[in-house]
Amino acid sequence: MNSTDVTKGFTEQFGKQAEHTFFAPGRINLIGEHTDYNGGHVFPCAISLGTYAAVGTNEDNAFRLYSANFPKVGIIDIPFSDLFQDKRGLWTDYFQGMARVMKTAGANFTHGLNVYINGNLPDGAGLSSSASLEMLVGTILNSLFDGGFEPLELVQFGVKVENDYIGVNSGVMDQFAIEMGRANQATLLDTNTMKYEYLPVEMGDNVIVIMNTNKRRELADSKYNERRSECEKALAMLQKGIEVKSLGQLSEDEFDENTYLIYDPILIKRARHAVFENQRTLKASKALQDGDLKTFGKLVSASGVSLAFDYEVTGIELDTLVTNALKQRGVLGARMTGAGFGGCAIAIVNSADVEDFIDNVGKAYREKIGYDAHFYVADIADGAKQLN
């Protein structure tokens, strides 16, 4: 898929030529899962799979929206006068949410837009299709209406849409990775301070393979909110005995010394993941900088174990992929990525072994789960941008 596909689709739907094209990537997180709302570090990168848009003007004072990913929905009109109406339960809620947040922040929509959208991110796969759409919309509206918003402002607008409009208490990682991504680099982001640095992803003879369970993350939103609530409860218990603003501020030793303040075994497990995952992320980013891929792979795998047993956000599909991935020749590490409860896992695989890896893991998954997983070699890409 490329911009030509959406310009053709635009003409078919709206009967005229598109004037602009845009792209926003998806993302994978190398390590640092469920740490972004706990004041910890994350280490994501944008990928070449993503969401495209072709855009043209109209004189109707409305956004006229079509997505090739939801063809049965057809064209949806959102008049400017309806921007602050309730959400409709459609994909257009993300467009409407971004538009209303930007309008509140001072954006001036001087004319209508026809927008044709098509993406190649599998829906519900945990590669951040919703954040990709939010950053795509933010880039479109900021570019075409001279909004003047900085990239980090668009990131915060996207988080606000998720939290206040869609109803998912997500952190900042997805929107940040998609808006701020750079080709062949991952971003080490301290979500507590929003300080970040770009680090080259140099894998030598290895590649990152994305493994899609093809199980939609149907429970992810409710369980995501539940995990965040559990971490907040654990933090509140710790704060009764020590001065700490977020779980991400604690070292492993500091956490171990103060677990007596958390008198719930489930909450201890949740908080332990947040604390230890943050430290793993710092160690992993340093290992990658040092070219120590063996250590990097071990830390990635350790993250997966913690997500399965302390945070409990995997499930049989992800566990089957990761367990079988780690049995294969040429694999340095593997774990789930994203919110969990379905979606995707990643593996670091020697490029010479990728074909056998996909065959073997795919066969084992089919035999265990009853349907196919899909595999993609990740291409680390730039963030959201206008293409023409």
From Swiss-Prot:
Gene3D superfamilies: 3.30.230.10, GHMP kinase, C-terminal domain. The record marks 27 as: Transition state stabilizer. It holds the Pfam family GHMP_kinases_C. This is Galactokinase. Substrate binds at residues 33-36, 224. The active site is at 174 (proton acceptor). GO terms for biological process: galactose metabolic process. It comes from Lacticaseibacillus casei (strain BL23). It is found in: Cytoplasm. Belongs to the GHMP kinase family. GalK subfamily. It is an enzyme of class 2 (transferase). The gene is galK. Mg(2+) binds at residues 130, 162. Its EC number is 2.7.1.6. SUPFAM superfamilies: GHMP Kinase, C-terminal domain (SSF55060), Ribosomal protein S5 domain 2-like (SSF54211). InterPro entries: Galactokinase, Galactokinase_bac, Galactokinase_CS, GalKase_N, GHMP_kinase_C_dom, GHMP_kinase_C_sf, GHMP_kinase_N_dom, GHMP_knse_ATP-bd_CS. Catalyzes the transfer of the gamma-phosphate of ATP to D-galactose to form alpha-D-galactose-1-phosphate (Gal-1-P). One of its GO terms (cellular component) is cytosol. PROSITE patterns: GALACTOKINASE, GHMP_KINASES_ATP. Keywords: ATP-binding, Carbohydrate metabolism, Cytoplasm, Galactose metabolism, Kinase, Magnesium, Metal-binding, Nucleotide-binding, Transferase. ATP binds at residues 67, 124-130. GO terms for molecular function: ATP binding; galactokinase activity; magnesium ion binding.
